[in-house]
Amino acid sequence: MGDDVVIRPYRTEDREAVREISWNTADQGRTVDLYFHDHKAVADILTQYYTDWEPQSLWVAECDRAVVGYLTGCMDTHRCNRVMVRKIGPKAVAEAIGRGALWRAETWRLALAFARTALLGGAPKVDLKKYPAHLHINLREGFRGRGLGRQLIEHFRRQVQEQGLPGIHLVAWGENECGRRFFEVMGFRLLRQQPLVLPEGRGFRRTSTVVYGWTKED
């Protein structure tokens, strides 16, 4: 495969590639199969808002006519949250149940992990007045560490500035030291760290999620 990679706006024909990359890399570059095997449900939760409701804020990295990575961006996190809660989330859950999710032990372990996370404070809180936009990046194996993440962020950051928004936030794994260093190099600063419980074998392990923020004043 050649080395020429192009960063460009998302197109509708990229949808399946973006969805496949999402579940195949979501666990710090690894597949989500350790936690949940319903790839459609995972892709719906991770990408459907961005591909179907806000495609103009989605950027892809393309090499030899194949999508090798993406940045899902959002200019209005309040709107994204509403769409997720009212439309995407309920539909994804209902369809997963229809495919037999309730009969799999992994589903109940994941649900219990979410419940334990909620008892520890739940999802990280973000000041959406200061950081209304957000982003998430995933790259295929073999295309990390080549400057593609930097280029994707720079394209999205220009979009945010052109719209006059004050800042961007992102949520990442607390234990992803490489990813955290990258975001810090890109000018993002740590805003908060929140406990996270995940299934591990027949038990659970405690880790964390971290929130990083960037403003045009930083």
Walk through the language-model features, giving the residues of each.
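Conserved acyl-donor/pantetheine-binding loop and adjacent beta-alpha core of acyl/acetyltransferases
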Residues: 78-136
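Conserved GNAT-fold acetyl-CoA-binding loop/helix
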Residues: 26-46, 85-93
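Active-site rim helix/loop that mediates acceptor-substrate recognition in acyltransferases
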Residues: 36-58, 63, 72
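Conserved GNAT acetyl-CoA-binding A-motif
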Residues: 131-133, 160-172
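Conserved beta-strand-loop-alpha-helix junction that forms the acyl-donor binding cleft
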Residues: 134-144, 170-180, 196-198
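A short beta-loop-alpha structural element at the N-terminal edge
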Residues: 6-20
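Conserved catalytic-core motifs of GNAT/GCN5-like acyltransferases
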Residues: 78, 171, 184, 189-204
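Conserved acetyl-CoA-binding loop-helix of GNAT-fold acetyltransferases
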Residues: 136, 145-159, 181, 185
